[in-house]
Amino acid sequence: MAIKPILFNTEMVRAILDGRKTCTRRLVKPQPDEKHIFPLGFVTDSTEKKEVGCFGFAANEYGGSIQYVKPPYRYAPGDILYVRETWHKYTKRIGKGESCRLAEFYGYKASVANSEDAEEPWHPSIHMPKEAARIWLKVTDVRVERLQEISEDGAVKEGIYVANCKDCNAPFGCDACPDEGYEEIDEFAELWDSTIKKSDIDRYGWDANPWVWVIEFERCEKPEE
């Protein structure tokens, strides 16, 4: 078991806290070239130690040349992840009378109704120290697939929740529109593209159908170290 960080934006943190998000997709970087389109799996043992833990893409279904890609932080089933999220520190007066004192706390944007009212500035998730982590996850599965291979169930595990029909905006369960009025995959596609830089959308956007890491997880307690 290894303990590693993972970054989530504020909306995804809220989905995790609500119990709606149990999976995340991250870009495979670099993407395998056009000649290597057959995923083989993770290398568990090799005479080349640098290949262990990498994912292999073959030139054809029988093998041929192989291109190796290293996963982010080499996430693996059983690993424990601490979530890095948008955060800050703030002070609060506690106690009364002679016992009154100032104490310092960590605050999290995902748990604030109106983050604009915060007196202390928010810090990016990438700068959050491990000691501030409040959400811990256990990796249950890691695999590679094309982005558009995601299923409706997979989109739901990503935290997608369609409350209204996209055709008529009626509450979920209306009978006036066809089933395609509710499309979790469409919502996920929009969410995915919103996270990609405009300069990279042709390479990594939904329509480009890039290879992605699919990391499934469950909530867990902070481990003893």
Language model: regions and residue ranges:
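Secondary-structure transition motif
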Residues: 1-225
